[in-house]
Amino acid sequence: MFMASTTSAVPWHLSQPTPAGNGSEGELLTARDPLLAQAELALLSTVFVAVALSNGLVLGALVRRGRRGRWAPMHVFIGHLCLADLAVALFQVLPQLAWDATDRFRGPDALCRAVKYLQMVGMYASSYMILAMTLDRHRAICRPMLAHRHGGGTHWNRPVLLAWAFSLLFSLPQLFIFAQRDVDGSGVLDCWARFAEPWGLRAYVTWIALMVFVAPALGIAACQVLIFREIHASLGPGPVPRAGGPRRGCRPGSPAEGARVSAAVAKTVKMTLVIVIVYVLCWAPFFLVQLWAAWDPEAPREGPPFVLLMLLASLNSCTNPWIYASFSSSISSELRSLLCCTWRRAPPSPGPQEESCATASSFLAKDTPS
């Protein structure tokens, strides 16, 4: 079975091919709705510029920050998240933009397979880097001694490597599903997928939805809840800890510390809500229409709202850099400096613990032995 679409910026295709019959390639190209095609190009162009510009700015701020000292652990994750989102822009949105402009994939079979593989790598990496970042913050807050032993400052760490490794591994089926194939015997070649009838497409789309959206969303939400519980527990009554011992369950020792803890808790709640809500809002419409199209033969695959929603696979890549930058005072200051073109000397880079504020728990991170 061949499933194809020239209107979906996703690593698989759900719409039925443009009717070929015995017409020429030129006749096939004119079968598209010109207004819808223009809307697709405009939307993809906007998304590409937004993703590339947003992540480029944040990555530039990180590089500039790193020149004055080693990266904090959170900087490492944000940097790799920016790289993953830039991969989405370069390997998913940009090829699809060129594809939509010509209506057919223009390139050899090897390029077809490579583009489809890299499109999926970007989707996986963007989601898994957020999950890895959240898991690391959970370890830093709930297991500070373990986090301290691993240290920081390097541009790579185990969660980052695992996120990239799983992204590269889980994307491998794309190399075998897609190829340059003849469009319904018309003589026109396009980059098409072949799925087993009738369950292949449904199984694959459902698997992608689970692995890219559902599982990471549940993991992110669970980690944020555990982080919040850890912070909340630190406010409760408990024995005064021994010197150098854990501080779980102890009250703040001064009004100033209490105010700092309360602010951290409030920031944690905001961070949790922003991460989970934005993640779900960005991915849910896209995967809902994909699952609908895969499971319902009568789905309105060619309707404008349906088609345009299928183009929003990379929407989360537009929001990622701003969410995490807004909760990092160091990155925010660098961004303001870049955007305002004020290249004045910034304050010295804090240690690796500074970026625990990204989970609104700087007060706990400071309990980590140094």
UniProtKB/Swiss-Prot annotation:
Site (Implicated in agonist binding): residue numbering on this chain: 102, 106
Keyword Transmembrane helix belongs to the record: yes
Keywords on record: Cell membrane, G-protein coupled receptor, Glycoprotein, Lipoprotein, Membrane, Palmitate, Receptor, Transducer, Transmembrane, Transmembrane helix
GO biological process: cellular response to hormone stimulus; G protein-coupled receptor signaling pathway; positive regulation of gene expression; positive regulation of vasoconstriction; regulation of systemic arterial blood pressure by vasopressin
Biased composition (Polar residues): 1-21
Segments for region (Disordered): 1-26, 347-370
Glycan-linked positions: 22
Role, per record: Receptor for arginine vasopressin. The activity of this receptor is mediated by G proteins which activate adenylate cyclase. Involved in renal water reabsorption.
Family as reported in the entry's similarity comment: Belongs to the G-protein coupled receptor 1 family. Vasopressin/oxytocin receptor subfamily.
Protein name: Vasopressin V2 receptor
Organism: Bos taurus
Gene that specifies this protein: AVPR2
